[in-house]
Every structure is written in C-alpha cells, then in structure tokens.
Amino acid sequence: MSYSEKPEDITKEEWMDKLNNVHIQRADMNRLIMNYLVTEGFKEAAEKFRMESGIEPNVDLDSLDERIKIREMVLKGQIQEAIALINSLHPELLDTNRYLYFHLQQQHLIELIRLRETEAALEFAQSQLAEQGEESRECLTEMERTLALLAFDNPEESPFGDLLNMMQRQKVWSEVNQAVLDYENRESTPKLAKLLKLLLWAQNELDQKKVKYSRMTDLSKGTIEDPK
C-alpha cells in the first residue's frame, strides 16, 4: 500500500483483538500500582499491596507518615494545623511557593464560611489575603469568588457552591502533596497518571488527523467506543 492510499478502517472487535494480544508483565503492572500508592501517600494500601504482590516500594513507607497527617488535616478542613505541620517539616516551602500558601489560606477562609463565622471570615480575608489579592489578579479573582459565598443564605447551593465540596479540599491537598514531593526531590506525579495523559495526547493527535479508531471515552472504566 502506498502512502497516498487510505488505510482500512479497523473495527472495535479488531482493535480489541489487538489489545488482547499485547502482553504486559504482571510485575510491571504491580510496579505501576505501587508507584501510585506511594506517590499519593496511601501507606496502609501500599503495605498490604507489598505483601500481596511481593513488589517493594522505592521508599521507606514510614517516610509517608507526615504527608498522611497533612492530608488528613486538609481533608478535615484543619488548614491552620496543616500549615503549622508543613512549616515544621519544611520551613521554607510556603515562603517559596506563594500560590500554594494563598490556596491554603483561601481554604481556611472557605472553612470559616462553612461554619457561618462571617465576622471571622471577613477579618481573616482582610488581614491575611488582601495583600496577595493586590499583588496578583488571579488571587484577587479567587478571593472575590470565595467571599461571594457570604452573599447567600445557602452558599452550598450558590453558583460558587463547588468551593464547599469535598473535591475542593482534595484539590488543595493534591497541590500540597505535589509541592512537598517536589521540595523533597521525589517523584510528584504517579507514572500511571503520566501514561493516561499520554493516552489522551495520542487520541487528540488522532482526532486532529481525523483518523477513525476505537476511542477510550471513560478512563476510569476503560470504556472503548466504536470508531467514528
């Protein structure tokens, strides 16, 4: 077939047959899983997986303890305690990462609003966040969006209610986790996440070239649709 000829379309069944014929070593898959558990700080799961798979992590799992404490604090909304622990572990981290520090302070403001502590929230925003808002347009926009929650009787149902969702705390924790790992010169992004990004990039390249292929539409379930 010459390069000018159009390649034959591959059906979903043919595509799945090709995938099923690709052999991946179980040990390689297990190492990907262990890497994810360690990077995300899931110590208990990593210990159990080590026993089940025989795969050794590339770090001492006890070194995850402090990150786990920080994660628990952030996910419980105990932001000031999390900041104190971060400062005790890495005194220069928040000084050199001002956006991370702002997002932690912003999250504390969100927690005050969640508790309906309006006066404390306004005072905290004025004393701790106003200066950063003046220096950064992005910070100012985020601060204004957060303070807008105070204008609603039921802020959870407002256009800005997503700030009060658990996913917001998770977002802040992910940022903290990556910053701590970077500061410690450790891998901050799981290899599995990098592979998924590579998959999305490859599919985007195929889409731009208008190639018909079996596209993965749901990464969490591995759902593959028929070629279009």
From Swiss-Prot:
Keywords: Developmental protein, Wnt signaling pathway. Residues 25-57 form the LisH domain. Residues 63-120 form the CTLH domain. Signal peptide: none annotated. PROSITE patterns: CTLH, LISH. Disruption phenotype: Morpholino knockdown produces morphants which exhibit loss or reduction of dorsal embryonic structures and Wnt signaling deficiency. GO terms for biological process: determination of dorsal identity; positive regulation of canonical Wnt signaling pathway; proteasome-mediated ubiquitin-dependent protein catabolic process; Wnt signaling pathway. One of its GO terms (cellular component) is cytoplasm. Disulfide bonds: none annotated. Belongs to the GID8 family. Identified in the CTLH complex that contains at least MAEA, RMND5A (or alternatively its paralog RMND5B), GID8, WDR26, and RANBP9 and/or RANBP10. Interacts with CTNNB1. Core component of the CTLH E3 ubiquitin-protein ligase complex that selectively accepts ubiquitin from UBE2H and mediates ubiquitination and subsequent proteasomal degradation of target proteins. Acts as a positive regulator of Wnt signaling pathway by promoting beta-catenin (CTNNB1) nuclear accumulation. Required for normal Wnt signaling and normal dorsoventral patterning during embryogenesis. This is Glucose-induced degradation protein 8-A homolog. It comes from Danio rerio. The gene is gid8a.
